[in-house]
């Protein structure tokens, strides 16, 4: 039997340094821009609230929640993969699941991170099912494969519902917005980081696998790369 390989303390320490560099160069500037645009409204959520709730859930439960089937925000086991679901805001302990426009957040999560033990091998090898491109004034500026993404549908609110579950009209939506509407199964998610992007106004929050692995380890959950299946 092939022995499972875990990360040593040295490897985890090196990973944390890498996380810090990557987040400092890319993720945190994008997060600040996203947080500024989403804003904080009475009862609404900002990007930092959601990021903190997902990280804490990972540390406490050793996994991330599946999506919610409706705006009620309760995790529905099995709702994972490429299909866009509602953010499970109630399961995450958040007071609400909508942005400053009153629109419910979308949520996409890799099934490999929704159960214990987490399938860290594929997640850390940059092969999760959630693929995201970030777009600025000059076009695409970054692309990532990540375990989880949260979508804000912007001012036009195309592709989602309000806090009462009423669907917004999608007539003015671009192809990118229609493709990542709640209920769709997009191969790629698109998030803008500048208002100069006119094609779509959706914004996407992501958490990298290394950051989530660190939180799982802090919670006492082993971060193990499952060995590949051997041939007969």
Give the predicted meaning of each segment:
Residues 42-45, 54-94, 114-120, 228-232:
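Short, glycine/small-hydrophobic-rich surface segments
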Residues 1-30:
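N-terminal single-pass transmembrane signal-anchor helix
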Residues 66, 103-106:
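A sequence-level detector of short linear motifs
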Residues 109:
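Short, surface-exposed polybasic-aromatic patches that bind anionic ligands, especially phosphate groups
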Residues 32-34, 58-59:
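Low-complexity Ser/Thr/Gly/Asn-rich repetitive segments
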Residues 37-40, 103, 113-232:
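Short, surface-exposed interaction loops/tails
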Residues 35-47:
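Membrane-proximal amphipathic alpha-helices
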């Amino acid at each position: 039997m092939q022995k499972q390989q875990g990360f040593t303390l040295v490897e985890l320490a090196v990973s944390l340094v890498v996380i810090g560099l990557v987040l400092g160069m890319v993720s945190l500037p994008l997060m600040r821009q996203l947080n500024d645009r989403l804003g904080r409204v009475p009862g609404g959520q900002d990007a930092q609230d959601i990021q903190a709730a997902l990280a804490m859930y990972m540390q406490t439960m050793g996994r991330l929640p599946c999506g919610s089937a409706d705006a009620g925000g309760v995790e529905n086991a099995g709702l994972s993969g490429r299909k866009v679901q509602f953010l499970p805001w109630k399961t995450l302990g958040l007071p609400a699941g909508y942005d400053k426009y009153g629109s419910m957040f979308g949520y996409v999560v890799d099934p490999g991170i929704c159960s214990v033990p987490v399938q860290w091998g594929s997640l850390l090898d940059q092969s999760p099912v959630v693929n995201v491109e970030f777009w600025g004034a000059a076009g695409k500026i970054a692309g990532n494969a990540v375990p989880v993404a949260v979508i804000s549908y912007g001012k036009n609110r195309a592709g989602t519902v309000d806090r009462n579950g009423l669907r917004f009209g999608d007539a003015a939506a671009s192809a990118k917005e229609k493709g990542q509407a709640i209920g769709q199964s997009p191969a790629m998610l698109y998030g803008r980081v500048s208002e100069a992007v006119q094609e779509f106004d959706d914004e996407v929050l992501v958490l990298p696998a290394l950051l989530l692995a660190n939180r799982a380890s802090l919670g006492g959950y082993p971060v193990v790369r499952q060995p590949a299946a051997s041939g007969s």
